């Protein structure tokens, strides 16, 4: 058949030539008798429950993790942060401490390039920091730059002073700080805030007008995906960057669609989505639904939520009273009710998987007799305390109320929204409150911001013992010495109990039925390894 077709094509060509073609003219190529089927592009359908509010990463009003998930694809960051707090190269292939701990030197990947083909250099990074700290530039989140040499407490660059972001050579980016820093701590805390901008396209632009540039409607980054199009607040289409240094994503397009959170799992089951943010997280109840439809559900490798009982140290002024509250609580029962078997009770704020986790400390076991004895020593007069909670934790609060009553501590519950809860604790309106937070591996992740004059959230009368230890931990660069200081701080907290650590819980992640290579737990750091994703 193939031979016959060849002969027919040759005969047709001769016939056409005989119909008067002039010398030097060439006949058009013969059309294929059976055209190849078009190869359809491979598209990953990605669901997200909240929209991004800007495509310029330093102009996000919300500063939300949902916006960061979009920036993470278009723009590049210095490193990739894993769920356990370890770091992998991204724009920086290596880094080290310098100048006695006052600086960090980043060695950039020479293969990095913006989507317009321009190589990314240290000058782009330095210029990004220079522009974003200009007092005239309406940078949102500028406080993240505070602490660099040559900036004030708001992160604004000070005119006439040396600035702590410089290009030491074309591929060496150096940051210099006002106080000593540990590179890994800095990156764990700040990596998701910093992106390199195509500053070669901002030459001559007035800093006051940077956020108004048309560039941010059709942004150019150096990340693993390229911007294609956007329906603001609804959908964004990205194309894989085949030249991304860490590898080309195993798809052609990534389409991120905003939909109601309640519909994400349903859409995944129906095949309308391949994956959803953040990390395919699912409740224990919905995990059963996912499994019943043949989807695999796996627990995360590290805790993703920390629960605490906030205490007002002004209305609970005696440490013995605060420790009595802890001993009255049945943490195991409370944890089981809240996390449905995915929690671990704790006596510390330090994440149990962190290298700084206390090795021998265990959570206080419930002891109502000891609680009653401490109450007597503290002179508790039977007053009623207010316990604030959100509506989703009303059942948990009721169980706590029962626990405390069994030890003789009176509590009344006030159900409020989250903003009112934190404002009420800050203003000293409530005596206790149930709260949760997203932890990380930093040794000061929870305490550093809560024991300051400006944010004395627990109304501690004397902050100096805490501040002295926090400062010592922050500036100590020797690992064993630092670990000893963290333990000393943790022991002080256990003795004084300005707040009560309750438990850490782990998330469940629905695995994509169509995409492999997803690092689900690390999405909690607002980064996703899309260069490893392959749609099958």
Where is each model-derived feature located?
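N-terminal lobe/hinge region of extracytoplasmic solute-binding protein
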Residues: 47-99, 130, 220-221
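Surface-exposed binding/hinge segments that line
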Residues: 144-203
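Extracytoplasmic/peripheral linker and loop segments enriched in polar/acidic and small residues
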Residues: 323, 335, 412-421, 446-513, ...
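Structural transition elements
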Residues: 340-377
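Ligand-site clamp/hinge motif
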Residues: 213, 241-287, 410
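Long beta-strand-rich cores associated with HINT superfamily self-processing modules
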Residues: 509-536
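Gly/Pro-rich hinge or "lid" segments in bacterial periplasmic/extracellular proteins
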Residues: 189-249, 253, 369, 373
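Periplasmic-binding protein-like
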Residues: 185, 297-302, 314-354, 396, ...
